[in-house]
Amino acid sequence: MKMKKVLAILLAGAMTFGLMACSGSDSKETDSKDTAAKSDEKLTIWAWDESFNIKAANEAKEIYAEKNPDVEVEVVTMAQDDIVAKLNTSLSSGSYDGLPDIVLIEDYRIQGYLNAYQDDFSDLSDIASAGDFAEYKTGVNQIDGKIYGVPFDSGVAAMFYRTDLIEEAGYTQDDMNDLTWDKYIEIGKAVKEKTGKAMLTLDPSDLGQIRMMLQSAGAWYTDADGKVDIADNQALKDAITTYKNLVDAGITKTTSDWDQFVGAFNNGEVASVPTGCWISPSVMKAEDQSGKWAVAAFPKMAENPDSVNASSIGGAGWYVLKNVGHEDTAKEFLKETFASNIDLMNQLAADINLVSTLKASSEAENYSKGVEFYGGQEIFGDFAEWTNEVPSVNYGENTYAIEDMMTEAVQAVMGGADMDKTLTDYQTQVEAAVAQ
């Protein structure tokens, strides 16, 4: 099996199966059959994360049911790895039994699916317009000019920071706006000196920071055509250099898992958290720190002219599996909910801290409300603004496979290896791996 198929299996989400039964045949068979078909119709949705994606799907289900009470919608919780395995086992064999009508798929994974199994996904161009969503989100779900997914959550990057620690170090909130990484390191050194706190956490096995730096410059591990782009990737070189500068400045705290990461800022061990907007609920768990946090735009790499104060990490979209049997109804469900419903987006902002990539959501009531924990800052409005500034990149088919290899390359450079030679070597290795 070619590497493309293998990586599609490893790098995507999955889908489950819904049944539609039709019955009835008496003297008034036309009306009877139509009613029976409608009342027996069932959609199945697969997603992961009970507190976020599943809750969103269930709230969408409730809204859809108001106008479509005869369509049953089942929302199924599955681990993302299980979704990946089940979807690809079925798609690779051409068997659709047990698959859902609608599935949530991560942005980093979808290109692998669409390139390998395009004919198995429904064209959603008639229910979702690219202009209605943040450009970087629709850039990942299109093939041949057709939109195959309804964008969902924004993973827009931001700089969460402790205002009290920044001020103790002699800086103001204005100093945190329009940051460059050089300025950030300068502030971090002062924070370390004045407070004894680290500025941020870094996990050597997770290249999330480099990924965000890359996208801030409109770059990735692959170029616009999806080809491996490592050896001559100036944005990648700038990102690795910035990463090394952070470590060399002595302002980082090393973590190795999620609990350590969250514990570091909840316990007041770091002064800032540069990551996706989805971290906000975790930051807010430290209720004793209410009023001591603010949010600024993600820093840019000053040495790279393409880098901006906006990036992304994570995010997903909703997709319809065409051959399960309820394509039209599944598309109608998405059209009436995630593709257009501002009331739903407004409610999800309150219930799960969703930052929607539907542009019109920025006009929703909850997006202009101040959040007490962040000193009254209208964080959803800021997130929405930054979301629309995120550069669009081609994530390619193999992001995670490439990054597994690049982790070794980054650590080699951190250990003193020549960057140009290291990246040239890894260009060859990665090209060989994805060509198999």
Across the structure, where does each feature detected by a protein language model lie?
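Short, low-complexity disordered leader/linker segments with a strong preference
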Residues: 1-44, 66, 421-424, 428-436
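Short, well-ordered beta-strand elements
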Residues: 38-50, 71-76, 101-102, 148, ...
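Mature extracytoplasmic/periplasmic domains
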Residues: 63, 119, 281, 316-400
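Extracytoplasmic "Venus flytrap"/periplasmic binding protein-like
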Residues: 63-135, 168-170, 269-272, 286-287
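Extracytoplasmic/periplasmic substrate-recognition and gating elements
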Residues: 93, 169, 245-251, 286-353, ...
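Hinge/lid segment of periplasmic solute-binding proteins
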Residues: 104-158, 183-187, 212-214, 294-298, ...
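Extracytoplasmic/periplasmic solute-binding protein
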Residues: 144-152, 157, 167, 182-229, ...
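Glycine-centered hinge/linker elements that transmit conformational signals in sensory
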Residues: 186-190, 226-255, 298
